[in-house]
Amino acid sequence: MEVNRKDNSFLITGGGGYFGFRLACALLKTSSKVVLFDVSPPIQDLPEGLIFMRADIRDYAQVEKAVRGSHCVFHIASYGMSGREQLNRKLIEEVNVKGTENILRACVAHSVPRLIYTSTFNVVFGGQEIKNGDESLPYLPLHLHPDHYSRTKSIAEMQVLKANNLALSNSTGVLRTCALRPAGIYGPGEQRHLPRIVSYIENGIFRFVYGDPDSLVEFVHVDNLVSAHLLAADALTEKQQCRAAGQAYFISDGRPVNNFEFFRPLVEGLGYSFPTLRLPISMIYFFAFLTEMVHFVVGRIYNFQPLLTRTEVYKTGVTHYFSMRKAREELGYEPKLYDLEDVVQWFQARGHGKKRSRSSIRKLILDVFVVVAFVAVLLSCLPVVGQ
């Protein structure tokens, strides 16, 4: 795939993260300048020609400095996607909403003609079943979002699409914007979800699955997501009749799959047995609710990592998948086939995998812990005697 990127300067907010860095490396092959904007640098060494700018998206002065001179901005930066991050409402609001406002304001002020926003499936999903949905679906009402991350991402996406066709300062042109709504990202070296899953596997916590075995969700390999962003940037140019301007697109591998079956190759590839115990999703949701309540009470003293949040239960246990038709027809997006083989190899190369011997005492303690935890949840559901 060839995308016209010569003589262009690109800025990637959130460029220090896994996806942002992969996108930058792809852009660097043919563009004149690629700048990574983030509060932390990538864990990888920067290839020659890639520029890192340490800055905070909440600070307009820093955003303005970074945007100046750019021809296209990929706005990836966000906060609160998973785990305990989902429970920090203040920071989520500041990064996802105010940060997006800063980016839009700076793009207009410095006559940046293109902005691609990395959104999420969650702008239309809040726990309800969706089969082969498309972009005609309305936004989920803000008050129905089960978490603040999804709510603020929805607000930010609406801001971005509303900004399409805004007149640029000191220019006769306008700002062209679009939004991509990716599924859960995977690939070798992914640092948010996969390490957490592997830690659960290795620590003996992954002892059960939940929900309907026929429930289907979607994922997107990082390289497919990179491809979609490059195509979207090109589809905002005059050469491509700006056909993506003001549009949103669902992006995935296009292969709905049961969440737990998707990770089976990872579990078994690392030498562990796939769990056979299946629990009702209502029980897991209630457990997640209790965990969030405990975190709300003690989080400032001990900011522990919740096993699951309510949103994560929905995302992993309730059917929701979307059509790629619009992305295929308007962007030319054609996802390639990937599996978890390279992910398994990545973890194995770093010493992960079941060891030959394991303490039977440790295993017993873990088994007892799991049983006690779920007995406690069940007992908490029972009515109090005498009331």
Swiss-Prot record:
Keyword Transmembrane in annotation: yes
Membrane topology: Multi-pass membrane protein
InterPro entries documented for this protein: 3Beta_OHSteriod_DH/Estase, Lipid_A_modif_metabolic_enz, NAD(P)-bd_dom_sf
Enzyme Commission identifier(s): 1.1.1.-
Pfam families given in the database record: 3Beta_HSD (PF01073)
Keyword Cytoplasm: no
Membrane-spanning residues: 279-299, 365-385
Active site: Y149
Entry keyword set: Membrane, NAD, Oxidoreductase, Transmembrane, Transmembrane helix
GO cellular component, one term: membrane
Main location group: membrane
Positions that bind NAD(+): K153
GO molecular function, one term: oxidoreductase activity, acting on the CH-OH group of donors, NAD or NADP as acceptor
Subcellular location field: Membrane
Family: Belongs to the 3-beta-HSD family.
Protein name, as recorded: Short-chain dehydrogenase/reductase family 42E member 1
Organism in which the protein naturally occurs: Danio rerio (Zebrafish)
Protein's gene: sdr42e1
